[in-house]
Amino acid sequence: MWDPLVNEFPDSVHGLRCMLAIKYLQALEDTYEPSTLGHDLVRDLISVIRARNYVEATRRYHHFHSRLEGSSKAELRQPIQEPCYCPHCPRHKSKTGLDEQAHVQKAHDVQDV
């Protein structure tokens, strides 16, 4: 947990509130299994709080709120059935094909005849 005697305080009251909210959500995140919907929603809520741009934070919050309203309390502890492809969280982006160049053909070994 954050120790106020060791670390510096944020510049504003809003910054302090955001920091305390994130610390609480990180503690709450540990109560959910990593592959559950509840864990994913808590991570989305942390990203809403960390957004620096108002428009980006509002967009993330609407995405979070629609996912929360569409799920029941029992579903929060269930494993996620289909992966999320939201553009704002890099943990959901697929990493396949990132290390290959786009227009390079693969060479094939040909046996000597």
Swiss-Prot record:
Assigned keywords, A-Z: Host cytoplasm, Host-virus interaction, Inhibition of host innate immune response by virus, Suppressor of RNA silencing, Viral immunoevasion
GO CC annotation terms, alphabetical: host cell perinuclear region of cytoplasm
Name of one Pfam family that matches: Gemini_V2
One GO BP: negative regulation of gene silencing by regulatory ncRNA
Keyword tRNA processing in annotation: no
Bias-annotated ranges (Basic and acidic residues): 96-113
Residue ranges of the region described as Disordered: 94-113
InterPro entries cross-referenced by the UniProt entry: Gemini_V2, WCCH
Protein location: Host cytoplasm, Host perinuclear region
Major localization class: host cell
Known role: Through its interaction with host SGS3, acts as a suppressor of RNA-mediated gene silencing, also known as post-transcriptional gene silencing (PTGS), a mechanism of plant viral defense that limits the accumulation of viral RNAs.
Family stated for the protein in its record: Belongs to the geminiviridae protein AV2/V2 family.
Oligomer and partners: Interacts with host SGS3.
Name under which the protein is recorded: Uncharacterized 13.1 kDa protein
